[in-house]
Design a protein with these regions (language model features):
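Basic/polar N-terminal segments that are highly enriched at the extreme N-terminus
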Residues: 1-4, 21-35
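Bacterial N-terminal signal peptides that target proteins for export
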Residues: 2-14
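Bacterial N-terminal signal peptides
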Residues: 12-22
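Short acidic-glycine loop/turn motifs at beta-strand connectors
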Residues: 101-107, 262-264, 282, 295
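Hydrophobic beta-strand core residues of beta-sandwich domains
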Residues: 199, 228-229, 281
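Short, structured beta-strand/loop micro-motifs enriched in basic residues and often containing a Trp
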Residues: 262-272
Length: 304
């Protein structure tokens, strides 16, 4: 993971809102009071996304020697990279959504645009009018022909699944529409796509502290006597408690929680001798959790 060092001034208010935890010991009050509403989350994630598009994209494109990056996604069949570039009000691609980045040099920067029926929020202005030019791929080809990029990146890769979101039919139609002189300039976007995914801005790292704090608070609650009754609560009960708790807080898990119990050989023998259920949590057990939440477009992965 790479980290970009600067935090834009306009993000300070949003970050102070996200990081407003108190030192109170009440699990439920703390978490419910400090989980942001969907609208508040959208404000923060959209600002972070805009910052990433303006800083991360130019850096990774230039590092990889890419002059144009074309991302194509169809409704109901999402490209995983496109999904990370959509604003909060866009849950998915609409019809065929094409996002384009064209490097115009250090002075003009990297232009971004949407060759789609609609602008993609305020982040990608629309550059296609279907009424005037019904051929969407024709419009894409026209833009690239005028820009004359030396290297055009598409999301296909033999190595990285997340950089391989372009479908066969979309790649075929794109290449057919592209001027012949540009076709041999098409390359895999894997260096750019992976760079985009692995890079975190300073604003994201500041926000991540809050996300981790929430995850640790949930774990502490789940490991408390408020939740676990020795000899009654099973590992499966606890796994589902965590899943339900995250859902009740308005958050998401990105994998099912795993609970494992580590015991001495003597304890295992006593459990077997007394015909006890080995899946029940007992006094003296060493309980291990693998747990992750999704919040503010960031994911945790905690083993404890």
């Amino acid at each position: 993971m790479r980290i970009l060092p600067c935090t834009p001034p306009w993000l300070r208010l949003a970050l102070s809102l996200a990081l407003s935890f108190t030192a109170s010991s009440g699990f439920a009050d703390d978490l419910n009071d400090h989980i942001l509403s969907l609208r508040e989350r959208a404000e923060i994630t959209d600002q972070i996304l805009e910052d990433r598009l303006e800083t991360v994209v130019p850096e990774v494109m230039r590092a990889a020697g890419i002059d144009a990056w074309v991302l194509i996604a169809r409704e109901y069949n999402e490209d995983p990279i496109v999904k990370t570039m959509l604003p909060a009000t866009w849950l998915n691609a609409r019809r065929r959504t094409v996002l384009m980045f064209i490097d115009q040099g250090p002075e003009l920067g990297v232009a971004r645009m949407a060759v789609a029926r609609y602008p993609v929020g305020k982040l990608f202005p629309g550059v296609w009018n279907p009424e005037q030019q019904p051929d969407q791929y024709g419009r894409i080809a026209q833009i690239l022909d005028e820009a004359n990029p030396a290297r055009i990146a598409l999301n296909y890769s033999d190595v990285y699944a997340l950089a391989d979101g372009l479908t066969y039919s979309e790649q075929r139609d794109f290449l057919q529409a592209l001027p012949i002189r540009l076709r041999d300039r098409v390359v895999s976007s894997e260096a750019v796509a992976v760079g985009w995914l692995e890079t975190r801005t300073a604003a994201e790292m500041a926000t991540y502290k809050t996300v981790m704090e929430i995850a640790h608070r949930i774990i502490a609650e789940g490991f408390s006597s408020d939740v676990i009754t020795p000899g009654v609560t099973s590992t499966e009960d606890l796994e589902w408690w965590f899943r339900q708790r995250v859902n009740d807080l308005g958050l998401q898990t990105w994998f099912h929680t795993s609970i494992e119990v580590e015991r001495s050989d003597r304890s295992k023998q006593e459990i077997a001798a007394n015909n006890l259920d080995p899946n029940l949590l007992l006094r003296g057990d060493h309980v291990h959790i693998d747990f992750g939440i999704s919040y503010l477009n960031l994911q945790t992965d905690t083993q404890q």
